[in-house]
Amino acid sequence: MKTIIISDFDETITRVDTICTIAKLPYLLNPRLKPEWGHFTKTYMDGYHKYKYNGTRSLPLLSSGVPTIISQSNFNKLFADELKYQNHNRVVELNSVNEITKQQIFKSISLDQMKTFARDQNHEDCLLRDGFKTFCSSVVKNFESDFYVLSINWSKEFIHEVIGDRRLKNSHIFCNDLKKVSDKCSQSYNGEFDCRLLTGSDKVKILGEILDKIDSGCNKEGNSCSYWYIGDSETDLLSILHPSTNGVLLINPQENPSKFIKITEKIIGIPKDKISSFEADNGPAWLQFCEKEGGKGAYLVKSWDSLKDLIMQVTKM
């Protein structure tokens, strides 16, 4: 059985949100560039309040009324409100990226400039979370075919350079990509965004498309696949809970306790006793918090090293 890894990028593979890092590039290349980045931060927050969701977001996601096993037949019904909430957030995100497009902040920046910038920012792999490279060499048998990135980041070129493995296919990176100038002779950005991947609902939709395409290929070859989706934030939760994946929420509670509690207790609804056990210094490195059809599950995992051990244990079952 092939193990397929589909991972978020920012704060899952990386230590920080690198969208903020990418935002520095236009101003490094042109220190006199206007408007300053604070303008776009304000635009985002203004849009967040202006387009605030007025519907019902049913939290926690795993309430007492949720069946113990998530399946293809009940997923859309169980998480209908969350799908609507995440889809509504497209309005907020579009308001923000449309302003960046309007101001042409990234227009004419070359792909080579982005690649060089990414390598400089990731000097000695400083952007990568501990254990990621070891995980890839130990778990991913064929990086060219078995590893995917699904992110709301802005640049395939940036993602590719930071991960740093030349075997990673460009076609296996899915993100809110900066568009390129249509002239094939010009390797630069035109200042616009793809805008297909902005929210958690976009992620789970594209995840389904990825799984369908891989399944089609595996069936032709007579193979079967085990899918793992790894993420760290609210935009990853629908993909983590998707019935076709073993889902992983990759957060170390010691490193980011407020984020951990918000997502695990308030949004997902994991029982406090399980959370307390996982939070402890001597607690487990990983913990299953829900079941899915076919023996799959969703897990809390503290690190890439712990995830390596979990996958190896699960694949031996």
Curated annotation (Swiss-Prot):
Highest taxon listed in the record's lineage: Eukaryota
Swiss-Prot/TrEMBL GO biological process terms: phosphate ion transport
GO MF term list: thiamine phosphate phosphatase activity
Regions that span the bilayer: none
Annotated PANTHER family: COLD TOLERANCE PROTEIN 1, UPF0655 PROTEIN YCR015C
Family the entry assigns: Belongs to the CTO1 family.
Function: Protein required for cold tolerance. Plays a role in the regulation of phosphate uptake.
Name of the protein described by the UniProt record: Cold tolerance protein 1
Organism: Saccharomyces cerevisiae (strain ATCC 204508 / S288c) (Baker's yeast)
Name of the encoding gene: CTO1
